[in-house]
């Protein structure tokens, strides 16, 4: 499976599939969509209304990756489950953190 993120000089750009009202705030690993694109599966408790789910996603990613909230922003997909999110910081450290967060969890 390919990575769901791309590296840049400023940080990384991450492809997400978000489930609002998902019962908990969590990163659920990687998923390959029907078109072959790999995304990070994210679920948040917030509803998809008034930008609440987008705020919850950026807060969850900031906390999980150890970056300030202002370092995470939605690039595209503000009204869609499929989003592209930019995270500013050291791209290698962010990529490694995402690899750990999306690794299959032992049963």
UniProtKB/Swiss-Prot annotation:
Listed InterPro entries: DUF167, YggU-like_sf
Superkingdom of this protein's organism: Bacteria
Alphabetical list of SUPFAM superfamilies matching this protein: YggU-like (SSF69786)
Gene3D superfamilies per the UniProt record, alphabetical: YggU-like
Family under the similarity heading: Belongs to the UPF0235 family.
The protein's name in its UniProt record: UPF0235 protein RPC_0058
Species in which this protein is naturally found: Rhodopseudomonas palustris (strain BisB18)
